[in-house]
Amino acid sequence: MSIKALILLDDASNGRLYLQAAQHLGLHPITLASDKAQCDMLAGEGMEAIRIDTDNLDGLIRECSRLSTTFDIVGITSALESVYATVGKLCRHFDLPGPNPESIERCCDKFVQRQLLAKAGVPIPAYRLAVNAAEVQSAAAEIGLPVVLKPAVGSGSSGVRLCRDVVELAEHTTYLLGGKHIWRSSPRMLVEEFAQGPYYSIDIMGDEFMGIASGEFGPPPHFIFQGTTYPAQLTSDECKRIADISLSCLRALDLEWGPKNIEFRWTNLGPIVVEVNPRLSGSPDPQLVKAAYGVDLITEHIKLVIGEEWDLRRKRSYVAAARKLVADCDGILDWIDGEASAAAVPGVAEVKLYVEPKAPIVRKGDYRDCIGHVIAASPSRATTEAVLKRAVDLIDWSITPFPSGDDAIAEFACAGLLG
């Protein structure tokens, strides 16, 4: 009997969780990735990884066909948004369960997504599309500052910035168009109204709602998550308003199959949709759901992918919270301590560091600025918050700034303290 294999395209923040969940389900995970370093790292961990251009659909079809002569390929998926439409095309070609690739492509283009949501009457921020600096300035003048300027395609808050005045607007426009931002296609930018208010996100599988989380960002102008709590403190009526709008989003975007994550801001006018993501949110959100409700969204997603019955029934009702550890300067990470002590605190569900000592730290103003996270969970919100604070306070690090332009060695270090 052939070994049952799950094909995974590229890697993401929760890619390792997909590999582990696949193995737990008795599957042999095979990663197809374009990054050689990623393949080498996975191979070093005993995982099967094949280097291939994941933007080449025909090449992927040939490789999957080759693998099917050895393995019983029971599913194809990815944790990465940029290749998720390709996943849908592969699933369609091999007659496997998967997302509608056309729906994914429409959703991943933030401008097209906005058009479809607006047509359906979904509350969204005012927006304009721009392809050059003049159009950015004109759009911002029409909408009114502050505005959010971001690439029309992308994820992880890469290239996303709050522009509070014309100087910040010009600076970020230059950044996006001046060669520093990597574009996968011709530059297209979204200029949109800054929807101000508490942040919430809802996780959905198919048409079933898993729950609503609240989130906190670090200081502007960037949108870097500092903390997430599951579930959010909302009334039943407030939850229903978010759920009803979410259903309208799914209908407008034809997103019936698989996992979704929808982001909101609760403004003076009520909940406004900031973004619809046609996939699971990245780490540590799946771990938060597992800590709060005992439901492994990644495992349930894989079950859906391979055509097995999936189950989102909650096994408990805890409050889970995560705190991101964010680098506060650029340089070389000298040391980071306290991981073991933090993990030993009763109520801590997970402590994860993304970097090791001597690693270079270069902040990008997005998810890549995070160097770790801590998750705590308990039946009580107050207890969870106290446990999380205690654990985070035990972790400390030091970053030595890079040498200055004259190559002088910096004589000081900036400490990473989270109070």
Residue ranges and their predicted role:
Residues 130, 160-165, 204-206, 267, ...:
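Short beta-strand-to-turn element immediately C-terminal to the catalytic PLP-Schiff-base lysine
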Residues 176-180, 185-188, 193-232, 240-273, ...:
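Phosphate-binding core of ATP-grasp and ATP-grasp-like enzymes
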Residues 31-46, 53-55, 360-363:
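Short, glycine/polar-rich helix-capping loops at beta-to-alpha or helix-loop-helix junctions
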Residues 43-131, 138, 370:
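Conserved N-proximal alpha/beta basic substrate-recognition cap immediately N-terminal to
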Residues 2-6:
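Extreme N-terminal starter segment of soluble prokaryotic enzymes
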Residues 18-27:
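A short, Lys/Arg-enriched amphipathic alpha-helix followed by its capping loop at the start of a domain
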Residues 15, 134, 302-419:
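Peripheral (often C-terminal) accessory segments that flank ATP-dependent C-N-forming ligase machineries
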Residues 108-189, 196, 229-244, 248, ...:
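Active-site nucleotide/adenylate-binding loops and adjacent lid/helix of ATP-dependent enzymes
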